[in-house]
């Protein structure tokens, strides 16, 4: 049986019009509007087996998600770190990409009410910032930048973090499914819509470099942004997943070396604006 989810801007969050000032729209409001547009487009899709349940934290965790965007996306961004889609113990709980609970609450300073998704899998309850499970990928990702940057404002001065796809897919057993696990036809329908949204988001933020976190995110970004004017550079970064033997050998060291190759370390550690290495 196909699974269909709807994500209307209903009681889970304010209507789109409430994000807009009468005379001017901020960059953060524009970004949130693009996310709501993407939600509306994705709500028309249906997904067959192996998908059992779909979560969209941009909907039910709207309050902390909105707080994340409005606090840290106030101006143009040179660099966008792009994940693929939410994890069950990260963004699915907090509404923040790679959003390990402790980092979101204690370092990023993000809070807010998290509602229950329309359909909740009993093995993957949404507990919001009370979730006791730590997401290893998120703890590694944000923990690295916490050590490198010191304060969130240093990181977000030139950078932002976003997921290509806002949806989390679960099998009937509760097992996490990545977009790569979906049937080819449905995967392409999903990611084509997300690709188009990424183009709009990158142009809105003025991004010059997209760093795909993981091979699939990098590949989709290259495909989506090919031929975009002005040109956007796309590079890759090893995913911090605990399922990656390479990441388990020392993701932080690998990440630092990669950022140094890309010329990004000065951008993340001092006040000067340093352009990414072409």
Curated annotation (Swiss-Prot):
Q: What is the lineage of its organism?
A: Eukaryota, Metazoa, Chordata, Craniata, Vertebrata
PANTHER family, sorted: SINGLE-STRAND SELECTIVE MONOFUNCTIONAL URACIL DNA GLYCOSYLASE
Query: What coarse category fits the chief subcellular location reported for this protein?
Result: nucleus
What is the protein name given in its UniProt record? Single-strand selective monofunctional uracil-DNA glycosylase
Name its cellular compartments: Nucleus
Functional description taken from the UniProt entry: Recognizes base lesions in the genome and initiates base excision DNA repair. Acts as a monofunctional DNA glycosylase specific for uracil (U) residues in DNA with a preference for single-stranded DNA substrates. The activity is greater toward mismatches (U/G) compared to matches (U/A). Excises uracil (U), 5-formyluracil (fU) and uracil derivatives bearing an oxidized group at C5 [5-hydroxyuracil (hoU) and 5-hydroxymethyluracil (hmU)] in ssDNA and dsDNA, but not analogous cytosine derivatives (5-hydroxycytosine and 5-formylcytosine), nor other oxidized bases.
**Where does this protein have coiled-coil stretches?**
none
Locate the region DNA-binding: 173-187
GO process annotations (BP)? base-excision repair; DNA repair
Enzyme class of the recorded protein, top EC level: hydrolase
Instruction: List cellular component terms (GO).
Output: nucleolus
Residue positions binding substrate = 84, 98, 163, 239
InterPro entries of this UniProt entry? Answer: SMUG1, Uracil-DNA_glycosylase-like, Uracil-DNA_glycosylase-like_sf
- Disulfide cross-links: none
Q: Which domain of life is it from?
A: Eukaryota
The family classification in the record reads: Belongs to the uracil-DNA glycosylase (UDG) superfamily. SMUG1 family.
Q: Does the keyword Transmembrane helix apply?
A: no
* Keyword annotations from UniProtKB, A to Z: DNA damage, DNA repair, DNA-binding, Hydrolase, Nucleus
Q: Quick check: keyword DNA repair in the entry?
A: yes
Give the Enzyme Commission number: 3.2.2.-
GO MF term set: DNA binding; DNA N-glycosylase activity; oxidized pyrimidine nucleobase lesion DNA N-glycosylase activity; single-strand selective uracil DNA N-glycosylase activity; uracil DNA N-glycosylase activity
Q: Which Pfam families match?
A: UDG (PF03167)
């Amino acid at each position: 049986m196909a699974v269909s989810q709807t994500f209307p801007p209903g009681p889970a969050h304010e209507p789109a019009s409430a994000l807009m000032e009468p005379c001017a729209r901020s960059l953060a409001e524009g970004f949130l509007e693009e996310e709501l547009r993407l939600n509306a487009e994705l709500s028309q899709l249906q997904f067959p087996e192996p998908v059992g349940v779909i979560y969209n934290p941009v909907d039910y965790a709207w309050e902390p998600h909105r707080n994340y965007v409005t606090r840290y996306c106030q101006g143009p961004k040179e660099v966008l770190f792009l994940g693929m889609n939410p994890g069950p113990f990260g963004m699915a709980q907090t509404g923040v990409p790679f959003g390990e609970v402790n980092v979101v609450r204690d370092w990023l300073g993000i809070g807010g009410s998290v509602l229950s998704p329309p359909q909740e899998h009993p093995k993957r309850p949404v507990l919001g910032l009370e979730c006791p499970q730590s997401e290893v990928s998120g703890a590694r990702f944000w923990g690295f930048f916490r050590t490198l940057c010191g304060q969130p404002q240093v990181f977000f001065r030139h950078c932002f973090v976003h997921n290509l796809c806002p949806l989390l897919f679960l099998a009937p057993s509760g097992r996490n499914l990545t977009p790569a696990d979906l049937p080819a036809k449905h995967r392409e329908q999903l990611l084509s819509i997300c690709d188009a949204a990424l183009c709009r988001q990158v142009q809105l933020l003025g991004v010059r470099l997209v760093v795909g976190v993981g091979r699939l995110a990098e590949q989709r970004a290259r495909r989506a942004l090919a031929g975009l004017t002005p040109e956007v550079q796309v590079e890759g970064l090893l995913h911090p997943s605990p399922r990656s033997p390479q990441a388990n050998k020392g993701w932080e060291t690998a990440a630092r070396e990669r950022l140094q190759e890309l010329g990004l370390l000065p951008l993340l550690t001092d006040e000067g604006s340093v352009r990414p290495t072409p």
